[in-house]
Amino acid sequence: MKKFLALSVFAALSHSAWADVNYSLAVTQPEHHLGEVSVEFPQTAQAHLDVKLPAWRTGRYEILNLANGVRFFEAKDDSGKALRWEKIDASTWRIHLDKATQVKVDYQIYANELGKRARHIDDSHAFIDASGFFMFSESFRQEPVTVNLDVPKAWRSVSGMANAGSKHSFKAADYDVLVDSPIETGISEQHKFAVDGRDYELVIWGEGNYDVDQMLEDLKKLVTTGSVIWDDYPYQRYVFMVHATSGAGGATEHLNSTIIQRPRDRFGSREDYLAFISTATHEFIHTWNVKAYRPEGLVPYDYTHMNFDKLLWIAEGSTSYFEDHLMVRAGISTTDEFLKTLTKTVNRHLLTPGRKVQSATETSFDKWIGQGGDHARNYSTNIYLEGSLISMALDIDLLSKSQGKQSYRDVHRALYNQYKMPHGFSANDVKTVLNDLTGRDYSQWWADNVDAPAAIDFDALFAKVGLELKRPKDAKAVASVDAMAKNTGELLTLTHVRRDGAAWQAGLTTDDKIVAINKKHVGKDLTASLETFKAGDKVTVDFIRRDTLQSTTLVLSNDFDKDKKLVANEDATAEQMALFKAWMGVDHPNLAKK
């Protein structure tokens, strides 16, 4: 009886050890970007167990085919016996079972994709996004998980996940939490601080020209701004991970952390620093918008296929819109810096021919297959730019019709309160929120500005908040070919030809190399080569295409040497200035000068 009881206890303990899904990663050959992964799955009585590595990672709407880094795959049962397996698609391994058993899989992972923010191993650190390292089974996706790392002694490990008994182990409620909680392990600089009862960490891998004290000061300001939009915070602890490196840039949001990558020498100037802190703000806002509530097409995540949705302009564009507002409200950036940034956004929109072709709905759905480049600029928009401006137009519309009492912030507060994960929201849900908030039907507005290419009247829009979009008085009219070019040795190569512009009408296209205008060699500056001409002039352009010298006639168009700028209207009324303050949370520039 005692022997049977002892065996029963042992069996129970063994089963409990494998009741969770257990992940292990050993950094074995860091100089070659290699690690060894083990995954232990609980007992299953299925005829086969399918295990998968995601094809993409959260926060990046692009198929990355992460399974291409897997080699030496093996599967064993709970007695150590090898199990037969086969690969049935690009990212799925099918393990055949002839009895009920726990399953262990082992494989080598190659991690040298730092810029994709999915996986990287070298002799100084490992960046671990579970999407790029850890396989999962749909059968056990909802089970608790643990992660254990075997890394060099000098390394420190940090994640948004809670520790699981040692400094290199972590635990999560399930695979979805794991995959949205990256781990930074290695030689890093770490700083901790607390604000309003919540804990924060700043972890920096790499050396650069950053000012840690300034970063900490502004991050402390930033994290207080969540209450400007939402009623509460969806976390108790948050981690800012920063890679100061070379050859990588960008950022990704996660549940209660973010990873931000910048060139190591791009922190020092005011412009570079604002780019960094605005990125941190963008990812911080995502803690609510995308992580706490998101469009229904992303709920739940399908890790092996494209997750299409028509509201990515809200997920990303509205986040971009709010980032500039929160930076001003936090006192991180000035009103003048905000107006400068918004000016660039508006001018970029106006110079994008695709804004007249593709709607926010379409660009959201097509994000997964967006190709970028010249064709995209001429025939497409993007979810960040277009979504930001549509959000602004809606915000000012709400404010102006309610005398500053209702705003787009109220819309996102309602989305957070009513559609928290695991629920998603639809376009109809957003329109319902708008209708409930205002008592007005926004269906036609949505049809005109979201489902159709948005035709924003910037002059009328900015007038409501006491601003003007105007060209500087010293701007001069200049001749233009409506194209952009870069210097490639002795010749200028066209990089963008604006649809229906002068160069387009003349038959020029991207990658044409400009040799001469009216038989005179074009130097390194296309604009300088046009200084002696005026709009309407016909010129002969000699160019090389496919190694063949060709010629065309081009009629120069009219342009200006300076773009329009968004400035304060010196004659703004008290009502307009009050609406500006309701919009931005700070005084109108006219009042700020007094």
Locations of regions flagged by a protein language model:
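C-terminal recognition in membrane/secretory proteostasis and scaffolding
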Residues: 323, 332-594
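Early extracytoplasmic/domain-onset interaction patches
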Residues: 19-57
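Juxtacatalytic substrate-recognition/specificity segment
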Residues: 189-312, 318, 322
